[in-house]
């Protein structure tokens, strides 16, 4: 079998499975429950790197595989899945579709940029990163569920505000600023 198999990728794959389940829930009209899957995927992503770094004697190939598999799973979990969720919530007009495609594209650009910069950084140092460059794509796993809790307060404005929220998040993925890691 190709790939690298150890406990270091379990949380990454668990987050991916949660996103897959969330997409199925969304397709079947259960977007509210799918939001829990999105949040759970974010929780898994928060700790997968910490778990991976606990393995002693990781090879360079294992490290590079970890960076790539994490970002590929992030495209699904925090790019495609939220796009599908927002589409199911009503972002279906021309403006909504353009915003969703922009959001996904910005997320992919952000992840590809991260991969290049992280591999370079790891070649130069073993120190942990202290800052994010741009808004991490995982942030949607907090932003979207919290935003959806405002639905009763926003009433008929919810959909227009959702458009603004997703557009803003997509822009923050690719705007160059530093955000201190927690």
Predicted regions, residues:
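Topogenic membrane-insertion module of multi-pass membrane proteins
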Residues: 1-49, 172-182
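Short, amphipathic, aromatic/basic-enriched membrane-interface segments that mark the entry/exit
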Residues: 1-10, 64-72, 127-133, 182
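Multi-pass membrane catalytic core of lipid/isoprenoid biosynthesis enzymes
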Residues: 8-13, 54-111
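Lipid-exposed faces of alpha-helical membrane segments in multi-pass integral membrane proteins
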Residues: 11-17, 37-40, 76-79, 98-105, ...
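Helix-coil boundary and interhelical linker segments in multi-pass alpha-helical membrane proteins
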Residues: 21-36, 76, 80-101, 146-162
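Transmembrane alpha-helical segments that form the membrane-embedded catalytic/substrate-channel core
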Residues: 45, 104-117, 167-181
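Cytosolic, membrane-interface loops and tails of multi-pass inner-membrane proteins
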Residues: 47-63, 113-130
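C-terminal membrane-associated helical module and adjoining short loops/tails
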Residues: 122-182
């Amino acid at each position: 079998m190709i790939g690298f198999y150890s406990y270091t990728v379990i949380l990454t794959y668990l987050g991916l499975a949660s996103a897959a389940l969330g997409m199925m829930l969304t397709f079947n009209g259960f977007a509210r429950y799918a939001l829990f899957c999105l949040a759970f995927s974010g929780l898994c992503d928060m700790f997968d790197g910490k778990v991976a770094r606990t393995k002693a004697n990781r090879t360079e190939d294992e490290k590079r595989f970890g960076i790539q598999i994490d970002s590929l799973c992030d495209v699904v979990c925090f790019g495609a899945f939220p796009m599908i969720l927002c589409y199911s919530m009503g972002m279906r007009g021309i403006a909504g579709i353009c915003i969703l495609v922009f959001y996904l594209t910005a997320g992919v650009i952000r992840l590809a940029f991260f991969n290049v910069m992280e591999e370079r950084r790891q070649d130069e140092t073993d120190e942990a990163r202290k800052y994010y460059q741009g808004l991490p794509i995982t942030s949607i796993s907090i932003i979207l569920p919290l935003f959806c809790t405002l639905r009763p307060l926003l009433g008929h404005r919810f959909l227009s505000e959702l458009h603004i929220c997703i557009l803003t998040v997509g822009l923050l993925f690719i705007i160059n600023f530093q955000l201190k890691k927690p």
